[in-house]
Every structure is written in C-alpha cells, then in structure tokens.
Amino acid sequence: MATPLFFTDNAVAKVRELIEEEENPDLKLRVFVTGGGCSGFQYGFSFDESQEEDDTVIERDGVKLLVDSMSYQYLVGATIDYQEGLQGSQFVVQNPNASSTCGCGSSFSI
C-alpha cells in the first residue's frame, strides 16, 4: 500500500482551532488537487461536513483530513503542514511527487 499523507502537529492544531471557531464538530479538512496555477496543478483546501465513499481519511488526534481518490494519487507521501510567517499564515503541502513547484508554492508539476 502507498504511504498515506502525513498531517503535522501544527496542521492538526490549526484545523482543531478552526473547527472550534465554527462550533461544528462534523467539519473535516478536505485537501484536493485541481488543474491550474503556473505549474499545471494547484492545491486546494476546504472544510466539508460530508465524507464521500471514495475519500481517503487520515485521522490524527480526533481531526480528520479527507482526500478524494483523484487527488490522492498526486498526494501520496505528502506532508500537510500549517505555517505562519512574514508573508502570512497558510496550509502548506510538501509533496515528494512534485517535480517542480512555482515560487509561491501553491502550484506544482509532476
């Protein structure tokens, strides 16, 4: 079986904080890949209450991360992190499958 995604402590803590702010314990973080961006593919993040039949679920410390089957093939082995810096705060994907990424890090190519 392929190596699943890794969900860092920072990402888990931020997702938990956002779910608590929304006061909806059914929310899960969905990570997906779409076509676009300057390198061909880009990452997307959203909160979702529903889990689809073909979703891969990564659960850590009570927080769930969902990935649809199409996106999963591009994200196998990736690390989902949350970083705060001078240029703002954001979820970041460290993807070993990406052959190149754009300068902003939000799009990639295989």
Curated annotation (Swiss-Prot):
Keywords: Iron, Iron-sulfur, Metal-binding. InterPro entries: FeS_biogenesis, FeS_cluster_insertion, FeS_cluster_insertion_CS, FeS_cluster_insertion_RrpA, HesB-like_dom_sf. The keyword Cell wall biogenesis/degradation does not apply. One of its GO terms (biological process) is iron-sulfur cluster assembly. GO terms for molecular function: 2 iron, 2 sulfur cluster binding; 4 iron, 4 sulfur cluster binding; iron ion binding. Iron-sulfur cluster binds at residues 38, 102, 104. Its cofactor is iron-sulfur cluster. It comes from the Bacteria. Binds 1 iron-sulfur cluster per subunit. NCBIfam families: iron-sulfur cluster assembly accessory protein, PRK13623.1. Required for insertion of 4Fe-4S clusters for at least IspG. Belongs to the HesB/IscA family. This is Iron-sulfur cluster insertion protein ErpA. It comes from Marinobacter nauticus (strain ATCC 700491 / DSM 11845 / VT8).
